[in-house]
Amino acid sequence: MSNSNISNGFASPSEDGARAFRAIMIAMARPGKILDLDFLVPPEPLSPAAGTVLLTLCDPDTPVKLLSTVSNKEVKDWLAFQTGAVTTEAHLASFVIGSWSEFNPINQFKKGNSKYPDRSATLIVECDDLKDSGMALRGPGIETVSYLSLPEIEAFQKNNAQFPLGVDFIFCAGSKIAALPRSTKGTKD
């Protein structure tokens, strides 16, 4: 493990971690709201936002799946050193990170069960860009309608149709994040 992997965590772990956690929770509570998470520079190819999400939400009890676009020795070593999180298979992971094309079919990931719907995966999707245009979002945390540029509509509609089961999404583009909880309905307006 190189020194750059060790030094690329939060500059001020308790303060940066608290601010990052708050931003992630705001994104989940306000679907479609684009926020900035510029707290660190993780190893490539992870974006600053995705690295911040992983450092904020993962610990030694968190199973993570790194899909092929983000899985390399530097990322694995960095994640292990910074969080202690273990890598696992996709169907066992609480957090899965990669590019959109790697997530299909979405039903390969944990979606919870009727007794424990919270035992589902959060998919961290690395994107080229995030814009407040595109798919119309409605549901909890949205006063009337919110818009978010998403890679497609059908997968999100199928995911929402399973509610309270399903997966949650955090989209990352550079230092920007936006979230789409499974409770959010999406339509093409």
Language model: regions and residue ranges:
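Internal, well-folded beta-alpha domain core
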Residues: 61-62, 73-189
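N-terminal, charge-rich interaction modules
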Residues: 1-63, 67-70, 81, 175, ...
